[in-house]
Amino acid sequence: MMSYIALAACIGLAMAANVDHDVKSAVNEVTTTKDGDTYCPVPLVGTKCGTSSIFHYWKCCGELNKECCFNLQTWVWVTLALFGVIFIASFVISLVRCICCRK
């Protein structure tokens, strides 16, 4: 019986360590800013991209990665999504209060 408990504990610890790594990498991706590419596809021959900021970065895209594409940083997308969820939730709550709390 103890061997089964020890085996279950080892499996649980292994899975928890893997989940911990996944959570850390997800948090790290959201909280870091990307520098982006400065030339697409390579310096001297490629197109010069703009400079990146804390709000956006440039990424090579298009046919043969010859064009510079504008991308928002991950934290900007998370913030916009959070504001969207808060806005929709407050709208729904206000609508429910208006319908249910009439005098």
From Swiss-Prot:
This is Protein SUP-1. It is found in: Cell membrane; Perikaryon; Cell projection; Synapse. Keywords: Cell membrane, Cell projection, Cytoplasmic vesicle, Membrane, Signal, Synapse, Transmembrane, Transmembrane helix. The chain crosses the membrane at residues 76-96. Pfam families: DUF2650 (PF10853). Its main location: membrane. Expressed in a subset of neurons and in body wall muscles. In the nervous system, expressed specifically in cholinergic motor neurons of the ventral nerve cord, a subset of cholinergic head neurons, anterior sublateral neurons, and body sublateral neurons (at protein level).
